[in-house]
A protein has these predicted regions:
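Short hydrophobic segments within beta-strands
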Residues: 12-17, 70, 94, 154
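Short, surface-exposed "cap/lid" segments of acyl-processing enzymes
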Residues: 2-44
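Short, surface-exposed alpha-helical segments at coil->helix boundaries
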Residues: 21-28, 50, 163-168
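Aromatic pocket-lining residues of Rossmann-like dinucleotide-binding sites
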Residues: 82-83
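Gly/Ala-rich beta-loop-alpha elbow adjacent to hydrolase catalytic centers
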Residues: 70-79
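The alpha/beta-hydrolase serine catalytic core
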Residues: 87-169, 173-180, 184-215
Length: 215
């Protein structure tokens, strides 16, 4: 059993698509004795963003005794693609993308195209605002997720990007604790959803880092 000292622990927030690093401020009151830092990554592929996250965590790891990760949506996927397992003490994933290959496959169906077309064109712009990339799909297939960090997952039953079956399979394979909010969306943004999120973090057992024990 270990006791953590004031300000030796960092809450690292990795936002999702369309998010901003400043969203980390929401979590500051939940961890009053921790430093809180939002990572403002500049790239949007797992190989580039993963490298950004790895470099940032590697530097932060020299400054803090423990890093606790909070990652939202694709931010969780990018974080798991970054090779940072050994530097993260605990992870909270909110609406995480845990099977990018399956999501891309679904988007290919939604766009009414085929893998052969995507391979031939390289990139296909869709009507729903996402660019499908053959290089991206190939990278995902060639680099399956490796993740060994103690992780808690919050999932909304009305999430349209990831199915409950997919997130449950991931949780079982990685011994992650899964909490499902009935009626919750992919984006936890309403007052009810935000309160549920905050209560979930409190119940997960790292409410404030000062002099807390963690087994």
């Amino acid at each position: 059993m270990k006791t953590f000292d004031i300000m030796t622990d960092l809450i690292l927030y990795v936002h999702g698509k369309g998010g901003i690093a400043a969203e980390c401020e929401h979590y500051r009151p939940l961890f009053p004795d921790c430093e809180v830092f939002g990572l403002d990554y500049q790239t949007f592929t797992p190989w580039e963003t993963g490298a950004e996250i790895h470099a940032a965590v590697e530097k932060l790891n020299t400054e803090y005794e423990n890093i606790i990760l909070i990652a939202n949506s694709i931010g969780a996927f990018f974080s798991m693609s970054a090779g940072i397992d050994s530097m993260i003490r605990k992870a909270y994933f909110i609406s995480p993308i845990v099977d990018m290959e399956k999501l891309i496959g679904n988007m290919i169906l939604w766009a009414n195209v085929t893998e052969a077309e995507l391979k031939a064109k390289g990139v296909i712009r869709t009507e729903f605002g996402e660019d499908l990339s053959w290089d991206y799909l190939c990278y995902v297939r060639q680099h399956p997720i490796q993740w060994s960090v103690p992780t808690s997952i919050l999932y909304g039953s009305s999430d349209t990007l990831t199915s409950l079956e997919t997130v449950r399979t991931f949780a079982e394979q990685h011994n992650a604790a899964l909490t499902v909010m009935e009626g919750g969306e992919h984006w936890f943004h309403t007052e009810e959803q935000t309160h549920f999120l905050d209560d979930w973090i409190r119940k997960e057992g790292w409410f404030g880092c000062a002099k807390r024990s963690f087994c």
